[in-house]
Amino acid sequence: MRYILQIFTGGWDKPNYTAEEILCRLKQLIPKMPVDKVILGWYPDETLYRSVGEYLHENGVDMLLWMPVFAELGDYVPMKPACDLWGKVLGSAAEQEGENFAFCCPTDRGNLQAVTDVYEKAFAKAEFDGIFLDRVRTQSFVGGAEGVLSCGCEKCRQAYRLHGVDLDEVAQACDLDKDRFFAADSDLLKHFLDAKQKIIAESILTLCRSFKARGLQVGLDVFAPLMSSFVGQSLPLLARDADFLKPMLYRCTFAPAGIGYEYEQLRRCAPGAGYPDIVTDEAFLKSELDALRGLPCRMYPGIEVNRRDDIAPTDADYVRRSLAAFAESGVEGATLSWDVMLAPDAHMPFSF
């Protein structure tokens, strides 16, 4: 199995590492395992990326820019924020490692233009081989029901109407009986989520085409299949326009994007909706991997290899067994997430 390495170089205003530190780590890892790509971002420092890219290209490894889309980018350039169905602007639902989870409107043309403008201004000269688009979604249940029920601006309302959904009806149903609205057999919820997934996919298609026209590969960061529809991610639709997807199969992360964590936020928001307890064990992981079969692009699911006692208490056995399940499923590879700079060598494939 082949690997993608992920490194969080820092937010918009503060670097986490120097080029020398990153190169030192990559020179430890790349000779010991088959690496296809390295994803780096999003601190804006073209000199750093050119320096790292020179080493990667000498070793036949592609370098991709890690670029946030509907969250984070608004900290760097002005963007139109998302609002809920009741007209309230959504704030940041959670924050970690300098990351901001305040989301922006997914249909606003100016927001989409900002993504390509920032690439051209801050990164185009760094000789990236591709771009890895993150936050290609709405807010999750971490922001409460209101986060999932977004965006409710007039432009988004028009987009939903084109897909046969009246957002006023959705808001009224949620106000009347939130548990009933969020139940798995709710027809209105299904129609809302189907429309939201199409709306998000239409916007991401615009970005994919724009970056592919620049000769760049495009990868997308996506939620695990269990929770992806709630944040507007149809994996079949997104896979049509991407070169690869990285479903975040994070079973040991107690923070946004962690599968169990996100699922429990759903149950907290709608405790009477009938969602059962789940165990995110290896049988569950196999079912999530099975859900990726047949999608029309390459799959490099993500496994959290870094360890943080507070939010990601991973260990070598968890990583080893997860990667074995990935390999057995037949996916193209795995993304070692979300920052190999923080991962113990014991969590790396060459240690197993």
Identify the role of each PLM range.
Residues 1-25, 306:
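Boundary/entry segment of secreted carbohydrate-active catalytic domains
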Residues 15-48, 125-130, 240, 244, ...:
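Catalytic domains of carbohydrate-active enzymes, especially glycoside hydrolases
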Residues 242, 246-260, 278-291, 295-352:
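Substrate-binding cleft of secreted/luminal carbohydrate-active enzymes
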Residues 96-282:
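Polysaccharide-binding and catalytic clefts of secreted carbohydrate-active enzymes
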Residues 53-54, 62-126, 205, 340:
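Active-site-adjacent "subsite" loops/lids of carbohydrate-active enzymes
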Residues 8-12, 43, 68-72, 135-138, ...:
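Active-site beta-loop-alpha junctions enriched in small/polar residues
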Residues 3-7, 38-40, 63-67, 129-134, ...:
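Hydrophobic faces of well-ordered beta-strands that scaffold small-molecule active sites
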Residues 24-29, 35-84, 188-215:
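Aromatic-lined substrate-binding rim segments of carbohydrate-active enzymes
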